[in-house]
Amino acid sequence: MTIHETLAADAHGEKAIERQSVYVYEAPVRIWHWINAFSILTLALTGYFIGSPLPSVPGEASANFLMGYIRFIHFAAGQLLAVFLILRVYWAFVGNVHARQIFYVPFWSGRFWKEWLHEVGWYTFLVRQPKKYVGHNPLPQFTMFLMFTLPLLFMAITGFALYSEGAGRDSWEYSLFGWVFSIWPNSQDIHTYHHLGMWVILVFVMVHIYVAVREDIMSRQSIISSMISGERLFKDRED
């Protein structure tokens, strides 16, 4: 939805004049964003060392439990991510329209693809002026769904499936996620895909940070501060 199509509304939902500042991201969305960022950073660091362990240290295991702590932190961060992902899905149903943008792409909409192409031109410096959107514009919405939402769900499912190997067949993890082994009977395959999923998300994170900084500067609308205050500020008005 572009800024031209969005009117401020009062408490009764009546149309009012267009504003330069629009409340976009509700508090639960912002809290989830930063907890999710912390969880992903923790999972990426600990997951890397789980896949590429540190050199063995001689001595009793009880005195050299570093890898055990790394695994524990990884499992704890994974469960934190999963809990808040469930809460985030819930908020997509009860929150405002912007709260559900990352969970779907309107593939059926010709207008979506037309504006998607315009944004591709803007990001590749082929278009001089961007359109202003209150929420996500079509290109980030498309990218977040394919390179973040779906991979995040995949990582949660495969992560709990791998955890169930140690928890045992009588665990709730195996009861809910044991079916993954019917798709990939070889546990190493799941480890490999889980590892590759991490890199997909990390590539997305790097692009996400670059685009957020770029848009804050070039498109003259607040991006980074919006995920702190919830308000999107348009620094100049389109005629």
UniProtKB/Swiss-Prot annotation:
One of its GO terms (molecular function) is electron transfer activity. It is found in: Cell membrane. Keywords: Cell membrane, Electron transport, Heme, Iron, Membrane, Metal-binding, Transmembrane, Transmembrane helix, Transport. GO terms for cellular component: plasma membrane. The keyword Transport applies. SUPFAM superfamilies: Transmembrane di-heme cytochromes. The chain crosses the membrane at residues 31-51, 75-95, 142-163, 196-213. One of its GO terms (biological process) is respiratory electron transport chain. It comes from the Bacteria. It is a multi-pass membrane protein. The keyword Iron applies. InterPro entries: Cyt_b561_bac/Ni-Hgenase, Di-haem_cyt_TM, Hydrogenase_cytochrome, Ni-dep_Hydgase_cyt-B. Disulfide bonds: none annotated. Its main location: membrane. B-type cytochrome involved in electron transfer from hydrogenase to oxygen. Belongs to the HupC/HyaC/HydC family. PANTHER family: NI/FE-HYDROGENASE 1 B-TYPE CYTOCHROME SUBUNIT (PTHR30485), NI_FE-HYDROGENASE 1 B-TYPE CYTOCHROME SUBUNIT-RELATED (PTHR30485:SF0). NCBIfam families: CytB-hydogenase (TIGR02125). This is Probable Ni/Fe-hydrogenase B-type cytochrome subunit.
